[in-house]
């Protein structure tokens, strides 16, 4: 646990009155993780089928059969590594609830700006509200700021009109400036 003074020593931010440092946590770049996993899978002798629209998933003679528009794959085990559009398939529709989360990025910050924020580590930060804000430093000296009021779509439907949401972006920007008024 961090006292208010200890939290302020980590990140100079008026709203922070305490905190918790989780030593065994981390942040990751999802695309880099996916590419790394694919390399490991390929080296192990398994195959990765990307950009494969799945029409059906069924069990046939104790094995799993995946049917695509171009053919079928039978395997003892499969990993369904999907993206947001998994909820558009019938099999996933009632198993997945899409939740939009939004991010914004700052311009690269100067050393003076970083000093004013008192944030010199590369630890990710997350608040503990119902709709969390999360942020981290990027390798090129920006702040990736995300979270806020996500949009939840029941019945598994997503839509391009939700990819950019001006109201939520304005809210993200406002909460960023409240967190870092410097």
Task: Please place each PLM-identified region on the residue numbering.
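Residue-level "edge-of-site" marker
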Residues: 5-6, 54
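Active-site substrate-recognition segment that forms the wall
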Residues: 54-56, 61-62, 71-112, 116-182
């Amino acid at each position: 646990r961090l006292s208010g003074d200890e939290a302020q020593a980590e990140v100079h931010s008026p709203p922070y009155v305490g905190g918790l440092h989780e030593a065994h946590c981390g942040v990751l770049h999802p695309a880099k993780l996916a590419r790394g996993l694919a390399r490991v899978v390929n080296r192990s002798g398994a195959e990765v089928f990307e950009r494969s629209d799945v029409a059906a998933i069924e069990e046939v003679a104790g094995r799993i059969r995946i049917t695509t528009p171009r053919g079928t794959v039978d395997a003892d085990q499969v990993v369904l590594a999907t993206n947001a559009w998994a909820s558009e398939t019938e099999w996933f529709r009632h198993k997945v609830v899409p939740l939009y989360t939004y991010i914004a990025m700052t311009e690269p910050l100067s050393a003076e700006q970083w000093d004013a924020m008192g944030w010199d580590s590369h630890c990710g930060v997350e608040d503990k509200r119902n709709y969390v804000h999360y942020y981290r430093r990027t390798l090129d000296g920006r702040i990736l700021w995300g979270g806020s009021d996500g949009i939840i779509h029941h019945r598994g439907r997503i839509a391009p009109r939700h990819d950019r949401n001006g109201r939520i972006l304005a809210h993200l920007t406002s909460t960023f400036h409240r967190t870092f008024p410097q």
